[in-house]
Swiss-Prot record:
GO cellular component, one term: cytosol
Entry's localization field: Cytoplasm
Gene transcribed to yield this protein: frr
Keywords noted in UniProt: Cytoplasm, Protein biosynthesis
Protein name (database record): Ribosome-recycling factor
One annotated GO molecular function: ribosomal large subunit binding
Family: Belongs to the RRF family.
GO biological process, one term: cytoplasmic translational termination
Functional summary from the UniProt entry: Responsible for the release of ribosomes from messenger RNA at the termination of protein biosynthesis. May increase the efficiency of translation by recycling ribosomes from one round of translation to another.
Length: 184
């Protein structure tokens, strides 16, 4: 039975990790190489992530630098960044692109907070799905006579506690990100 609990814990941790990754992709006014993670580039007849055709670094707090490995890919990477709806305007400098980050206005900050709330809700839903799977497993185990009713209740309480801790972590991460976004 502890194997199932460990699996639930791993899946809950996965929901938190996915939420952290989503939050990292939100632009908060500070440069981060994660901001470009979602950008796909048309390269060599296929679509690939930007980090497979270039090196993304942050030389300054408000600047992202993209060092493209193949000179023929400069135009494709530039186009992918401009068309990404992130509001970036790269400056081409040989095989490097420099991306200055403008200040976020109040409206954009509120939009980002709203987006982060959506990410948080998706993470909470994922945690609840894991809880439901755990509860269903326990009910089936009790019905099949593998565990007693008391064991089922005790383990259900453990699953609920794990879910509450996961949702609490998600809420804490969300409030930290909100504060970071709204910081002027």
């Amino acid at each position: 039975m502890s194997g199932e609990y460990d699996d639930l814990k791993r899946r809950m941790d996965g929901a938190i990790a996915a939420f952290k990754h989503d939050l990292a992709s939100l632009r908060t006014g500070r440069a981060s190489s994660n901001l470009l993670d979602a950008i796909q580039v048309q390269a060599y007849g296929t679509t690939m992530p930007i980090n497979q055709v270039a090196n993304v670094t942050v030389p300054e707090p408000r600047m992202i630098s993209v060092s493209i490995w193949d000179k023929s890919m400069v135009g494709a990477v530039d186009r992918a960044i401009r068309e990404s709806n992130l509001g970036f305007n790269p400056i081409v400098d040989g095989t490097n692109l420099r991306i200055p980050l403008p200040e976020l206005n109040e409206q954009r900050r509120k939009e980002l907070v709203k987006i982060s709330h959506g990410y948080a809700e998706n993470a909470r839903v994922a945690a609840r799905h894991v809880r439901r799977d755990g509860m269903d497993f326990l009910k089936k185990a009790e019905k099949d006579g593998v565990i007693s009713e008391d064991d089922q209740r005790k383990r259900s309480d453990q699953v609920q506690k794990l879910t509450d801790e996961t949702i609490s972590t998600i809420d804490h991460l969300l409030s930290d990100k909100e504060a970071e976004i709204m910081q002027v």
